[in-house]
Amino acid sequence: MSIKTRKIGWIGAGRMGYEMAQRLARGGCDITVWNRTRAKAEPLARDGAKIADRLTDLAGCDILFCMVATYADVKEVIAGPQGVYSNARAGGGGVPPIVVECSSISLDGSAELREILAGFGSKYLAAPVSGNAKVIKAGKLSFVCSGPKPVFDEVMPFLKLI
């Protein structure tokens, strides 16, 4: 599948997440972005991104990226009462088959997230980043990835675009 035919969900439009999502949008990806403060994500629409009203709007994406501040935030947006997976618990709707977590979270948090996602049948790639917004704009962001090789291979074209 082409990167332009995969549906990408993106959570987090802060300093780093905004720039990362923007590179995907400008690269022609079909990307839908959610941010707690919607106004911070709205400018991404000029680059072709769709803006989600609810986290559950991202449940039907092929690959979900998450770039938020803390593990508590990660857990809330993924598995919280209003999180991406909240309808799946109630039996209403699909879930992303792949989740790529780009925040810097603890090893324990990453292991817990992997277990939560596995319970829904989703695959997990830990992909914390090294760099800043200037590095992202220059296309030089570094990822430190951990997870199954087939998942890494599937996500790699998007990581390269970022």
Give a label for each model feature:
Residues 34, 67, 103, 145-146:
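Active-site-adjacent beta-strand anchor residues
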